[in-house]
Each structure stands twice: as C-alpha cells, then as structure tokens.
C-alpha cells in the first residue's frame, strides 16, 4: 500500500486509488469510478431541466442520448463514473443527464461495497450503477464537463457525426470557447 521513494531519507508515499488517498476524483472532475460491466453501452436521459442549462441540449429532440455507438453500442458503458457530493462533487456541480438500462453484468467497483448487501453511501445498489454527465464552473472561471463514461467517444462518429451526442458536445465546446 505504501512505496518508499528513492533518494535521501525515508519518504513513503501511499499508492492506489485517489479516493483512498484523500483526493477523490469527484473533487476534480465532478464524477468518480463507480461501476463496470462488459463492453456494452447504454444511453443517457436528461435529468436537469433548469433553464440555465437549456444551452447544453439545444438541437436535441430525442429523449435518449447516445443509444448508439461504435463502442459497445451506446454512449454510457464499460466503466461508469457518477457524481457523489459526499465524496467531493462540488456543490455547484449539476447532473445534466444520467445513464440507465445497463445490462445485468454491470457491477459496483469494490470500493462502493460496504458488505455483500450494502453500499458505502447507503444507497440501493442499482441506483449507483450509472454514469452521470455533469457540468460546473470553478471559482477561477474554469469550466468542467464530464461524461461519466469511457464509451462516450464511440458515439461521436455515429451517422457521420450527425447525432445527439455530437450535438451535445458541440454545445459544450462552444460554451467553453467563449
């Protein structure tokens, strides 16, 4: 669990998951690794209908976002990251969309299990099997967008980039460039 650094003196650095080292990824990106499955993908459903975030979904008329793709057949799959305010997701971080409809082979990662029946956050197991798409701005004006899924990029080129995942990402990047 600890590794001795090379050089003068005895300096030990703890290795392993950021979460166990006191710096969970939720603090940096808004989301952290929560579940994993076979190389299959699912879709996102919009969760945030606040008018302040309509710009993210401009040009998207479908309810399901990313129910297609070259990586597992969907934008949300393989590894799923979710927001967790208890682990450091910033309070101003908004969950824009969450995935659902994952195959039964998806399981929580070990650090989410308290026992074989309960989870660390105390939430029902199925509710943690999701990818969250999040957005927030930090105190220095930086903007953060996280997809919460490793297969998101595989949905971008679907239909020659003429799809709701590409539209959504274009909306985000246009906002970032202003």
Regions picked out by a protein language model, each given a short descriptive name:
Residues 97, 143-146:
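Structural recognition of the beta-strand scaffold that forms the well-ordered cores
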Residues 13-139:
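Catalytic beta-strand/loop cores that center a nucleophilic Ser/Cys/Thr
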Residues 103-105, 152-155:
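Flexible loop/turn segments at secondary-structure boundaries
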Residues 160-177:
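Short secondary-structure subsegments characteristic of cysteine-rich extracellular domains
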Residues 136-140, 170-173:
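Terminal low-complexity/disordered tails
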Residues 6, 122, 153-162:
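Active-site rim elements
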Residues 140-141, 148-154:
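Catalytic grooves of carbohydrate-active enzymes
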Residues 1-12:
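Short, small-residue-biased leader/transition segments that mark boundaries at the very start
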